[in-house]
Amino acid sequence: MAANRHGGHLPLPEGLAAPTHRTVIYYAKCDFSPSEERCVNRFTGRPGPLTLMRDRSNVEHMVLITVKTDEEDRNTAEQNQARARSRSQETKKILTLLAPQIDYNPLTLDSLDHNLGQRAVIFSYGPNLHQRLTTSALELQRACKTLKLHSILRIESGRHFTSKAVQYVVENEDDILTAALIGENNLYQINTETLSATRLVTDALSWAEYKPLDVTCNAVMKPPREGVQPMCLVASSPVSDYNFNKYLMITPSCTAISLHMGHPYPRVSQGIFHVHSSTRTMGRQCCDYLFHSSLLPNGNTTAFACGYYVTSTTGSGSIPTSVNEQILHAASAQGRSLNNLGVPVVSGFLKPLPRCSEVPNNVITHVSQLRTASERDLNLCRVRAGQFVAAVGAYDPTSGPDKSPYLYRDSIDSLNRAIQATKLFYQMCETPCVSSYQREFGSCSTLHHLLALVSPKGMTVHISRLPEEITKALRSVPVLEEDTVCAFVSGYFFNCFSSQLFLVIDDKVKTTPSGQIHFTDILKKAGNLCGAPVYILGRTCNDIGIHCVNDLYHPRDLSVLDSQATSSMTLTVQPHASVVSATLQPQEPHEEDESIDWAMFGTSSTISNILSHPAVASKSNIIRRLDRCGNGLIAQQPGIGPSDAPVSDYAIICDSSMFPARLENDAQSIKKISKQEAQRAYAQIHKWFGTEKLFLNTISAKVIALGEQAYKLSRNPIVGVKYAIAEAITNIMFGPDCVLEDITLTVAAHWNKQETAALYRVLFACKEMCRELNVNLSITDASDSRDTPIQDTDAANTVVVTASARVTSIERITPALKKAENALVHVCLSKELTLSGSVFENSFTAFSSHLPDLDTSKLRDMFYAVKHLISKNLVVAGHDISDGGLITTAAEMCFASTFGVTVNLPSALPALMYLVSETPGALLEVPKEHLSTVTTLLSERGLTWYAVGTVNNVKNLSIYDNGTHLLTESINILNSKWMSYAEESFETCEPHIESMYRNDYGNNAMDLKHLEDLCTHKPLQLYTCPSHPVSVAVLTFPGCPDPVATLQAFANVGFLSYPISTEFLLQGNNLNAFSCLAVSGSSAFEEEGTGTRIAIYTLLQCDLAKNCLKEFFQRPDTLSLCCGELGTQLLAACQVVGDTHPSRGDISSNPESWTLELEPNASKHYESLWLNFHVPQTTKSIILQALRGTIFQDGLWQVLGLRYKHDAQEYIMQQNGTIAMSYHSAKINPYLYAMHYPRNPSGNSSVAGICSKNGRHLALLVEPALSFHTWQWQHIPKPLVTSPWALMYQCMFLWCVKE
């Protein structure tokens, strides 16, 4: 579906044929996947057409390597032998690099199926080998070209399931296994017996028919005709300044921090920020990121919020196992793709839509993204005809939406390289030289994006300048008709989607000391440095449309304008007939006046069912599989409290993690230090601390919050969207101080294209409410739902609202309860209890009740009343009331803390109805001595409020109605109900893990020993050394996210932080100017472990780079802090850490000689967890010397373990003091190392950090830069002013100055 191969009417199969090749299959042992385990359990010992014998089932990894072969009659025997040896060596190299993908198990050419006999059950499956390469295979293919492994054409992964049946093989055995093992996933059976003789596809080409633009998007986001404003502009409502670029953009000011390669970090400037939101059926992961980047070019996206709707659910909202897998695959593909761009996911939701039509693979995704840009980087040059049109990045086309398990997702490695190349190009040009970056809305074809790029003009495209894959296929056929060429180019280029970046470049030149250089040549140079292909497609012109010039066999010189060039094909967007009709009016909401017999519902069972409903239950199964704060800018992430409960109402994203004093170069806060003073300070830790408060309430940040009410929208769209706005407002209400005028609401709609008239009314309802609230409103996206007939009222119509605001403080209120005996106050917009569209109504009733309208003035009054109470410290905790009602809000506040609550229900209201009502409002924790003050103020504002109970310290939830006891339940039991969806998801969709320890997470104790008083009461002292400035080289790898957090952490303590590309080392430069080397992060490959090995292998293959690193490590005045996958693997590969045997001399690029390997975590997935760490008292590490003996926590992203190459390697390191850090239990006993997942991510070695034998070089699996400040911590067990992690960097600065 995502990779159709060929247009049937084109006579060109030979042009797409791969070189002569053969495919070899390698097998390696592995564990059962969840679907394989279910298959074995289902068919083992069970009567039916297929019965498997007990304990005879196995599964293996398959690595399928397609290798180029030669036609033997054209070569001599010696040549054939030499080439065979070369192919064998190249295959061996790539298999070594693929080791993490197969869990380091040995590969063999023989499967385990050879001794199963006549009743053998054999089923191999994987990607479709007759379509374009999967994303993982494409990344590996490009890596092979870089490494000059020329014989390797394609590398794919598959699974080989074997068993033995009780009966002889039945005819439909393959159909049975296909349904059990593949299901609705985009996988195919592979015939391993005939594969070696089968010709496979070995290129990236994909065929697509022309597809018009999204109808709903056209109707809302684009002008219906010339001279008429688009609906998105008409329905928007600005309060503050705005501009118009595709739609109305509210762009508040902020501080912009930028990275310039080879220059000290950071560069600070005045900037703007903007939030773009979109909701669409799961398709391309980065299409909206690319669109937003075109609005704010050269900027930085700093946060994403992701939500998911699923329509294939039961009436109660429960999610079948197969659909659950699709959700997790979608969330992983979407979230991890965004994470690999270097951006965390900070908020989200999951909502099953049980009353919608069930469509397989119909996961609807919402993405809101926050992006900042420097105002000076937004300047464009003038638009003129004759400018160059460029495409930057690898051409990885897809022909349509992908589906689970998303094998054809966007290659983030390629996209990162393209982004890095365009930013480097802009920096190298030093003047505005781009006139357009524009893209079309949504997941569109290349044709639509190019037309948007040059609008309102046109462009010529020279076929000879298209990506190499296309021109090579065309040139392989001697004679082609003009129509065939045009059809080929349309199907394989213009009609496909690609994540390339498009830009229009000025046709002028830049004057340099060495002469004049064209801007296009600068772009090509930037592309070469970053590993991103650059295609100069053609030039702009005044004639509307895309005009193709067939110069395939006689390429034209684009530097010379050729007015004689004739077009062989002109492409434009085909017009649409409007679907909006005056006779098509939205249906009135269907309401049934039926009363509920509340006596039928038990309080305990109802609460349990609501807490376990997927819309309400914990989403930790999704949230903990995504990076939540990997750029170091997140002051409030989803997890709250000691148990990391994902209940936060909002997220806070700081402009920078730099101390304001550093950004402003404040001489009063920064103390100058000499080499001699540094020597004294290094030995006296108390001098590392000062008295100047470094973070006042003036830190610049943004706060964002989501609002969505799909259930209520299905009852009454006009009123339901107001509830979504109310949820966004009540969520952001608990964040840092702001006023309504500062808030911008961005709205994204996903709507049935047959009901656009109803969507118009919904958008105008948004506008009316926002005007009454006096908040900014911007409509940023609209898209079609799956095709449904007009009479089908079960279409998934949704509107998601994202609230954002700039704030000057990170002080806020969270749902975590603070103190026993504090009062609980329920404040709401109305005395009317809202059941329509509630989780209760969806779960327990078969009818729809009336959805009451909202009083906007009451919402405004409640917002300001709560803000006032918070500012006076009269409210110490709070949580909005939304899905699940008051009882869910109270329970979640308990889950986020160590307290319980006692609820005393108002006497005039039905007890259970009151508990499950979803009338917008909030539950406030108020110090008991201030209760009367709070309630008086709420009454004066005309708000409805109820004093509903108190906080208790017995960890129970007790409910009383008029003094009658209704329920007392342990918080732990309620939490297990709330966690049930996540647990069920884990059990059905994850590999086998010891369930006994799976929930041993959170509640980390901390023991700072001698540092406790200092870290609790004193801030870090900021130093600078003008006489001996010290510099750190922060190494960046092509295709990997920029190490922003690491750069900022080093700059915070006084280093001159330089981002240095690996190209700097590959070109033979040295590191003599640097006292410290830092590496962090991981590869952006889909298979991150393999990508990391390839990145290190590529670097160390170069003798110049190896010698540079060796010289640096051998200098006595250097330190290294290498973190995460890339850092740890680099130090191990250079034999700096982990080498317990006599040194073997030179650094080797061969992975088999590396001293350590990285082991994936036990869940086999990326995870973001907050774990405890222990620094041994005996460690030799200089960097950690101040922290010896301490136990404290940090966030761990892409949790890993270490795999040793030699016996007793860990014991020897323990004895020689080179173990620097270990995973630890929740307790402060120094001997209680973490032995099991998740506290020990791999479940094997507990070692999390290793230093060199001289103590100067440190490899950590953790990223300490993400916890440099206490505000970056998910939870602080004790009040801290200074993070212990900051002392590492302070120690390094003082050591480097004194040395």
Curated annotation (Swiss-Prot):
SMART domains listed in its UniProt record: GATase_5 (SM01211)
Keyword rRNA processing applies: no
One GO MF term: phosphoribosylformylglycinamidine synthase activity
Keyword field contains Nucleotidyltransferase: no
GO BP terms in the entry: intracellular transport of virus; purine nucleotide biosynthetic process
GO CC annotation, single: viral tegument
Source domain of life: Viruses
Subcellular location: Virion tegument
Keyword annotations from UniProtKB, A to Z: Virion, Virion tegument
Stored Gene3D superfamilies: 3.40.50.880, PurM-like C-terminal domain, PurM-like, N-terminal domain
NCBIfam families referenced in this protein's UniProt entry, alphabetically: tegu_FGAM_synt
PANTHER family per UniProt: PHOSPHORIBOSYLFORMYLGLYCINAMIDINE SYNTHASE
Identification of the protein by name: Probable membrane antigen 75
Lineage per the UniProt record: Viruses, Duplodnaviria, Heunggongvirae, Peploviricota, Herviviricetes
